[in-house]
Amino acid sequence: MISNRVNNIKPSLTIATNMKAQELKRAGKDVIVLAAGEPDFDTPDHIKSAAIEAINNGFTKYVPGKGTPDLQLAIQKKFQRDNNLDYELGNITVGVGGKHIIYNAFSATINSGDEVIIPAPYWVSYPDIVILNDGKPVIVECGEQNGFKITPEDLEKHINPKTKWLMLNSPSNPTGSMYSKDELTALGDCLLY
């Protein structure tokens, strides 16, 4: 009953590690859990109050898949104000989380056999998201000597006509390494071939 695509993905290492850590905690072990990336703070009160107010005011119906126009506009203004970036409203999409947005983007753009370059270490979900969309993850090891970041030379070695995406986030999950503007520009130059 399950599709072949789903049978090709592995169980979540994040969930498995988190479950093991919780098991050790229940057994009385002193464990610091770094697996699931759960914040160690509660949702701020003003956000909780706004959510409760929205529910009490009947804001409980379906909204557009890309987010409400008011939320898209608020995001557009935030990027203009805080980051000096101008985005068209049509280029702003709101999702339930990063994994959801990445999955949707790959679903819309990856064809069978397309390759996605993924610098390692990487967030454990990236390869499976590619596989679920019938693509091929291309893992590029990025060692400590480069700050766990992909270099233009390593990127160029892995780009080919089947390359559709470079999966790049800064700060990196899981290492926290950040790319400078110059590093991003150099990587961008490689992608313009």
Give the label of every model feature segment.
Residues 2-3, 7-97, 104:
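N-terminal small-domain helix-loop-helix segment of the aminotransferase-like
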Residues 26, 56, 110, 159-160, ...:
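Residue-level signal for alpha-helix termini/capping positions
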Residues 30, 115, 136, 162-165:
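Structural signature of beta-strand start/N-cap positions in the alpha/beta core
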Residues 86-92, 112-115, 162:
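Short acidic capping loops at alpha-helix termini that bridge into adjacent secondary structure
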Residues 108-130:
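Conserved PLP-anchoring active-site segment centered on the Schiff-base-forming lysine
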Residues 132-138:
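A short helix-loop-beta submotif of the ANL/AMP-binding
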Residues 138, 143-193:
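Active-site phosphate-binding strand-loop segment of PLP-dependent enzymes
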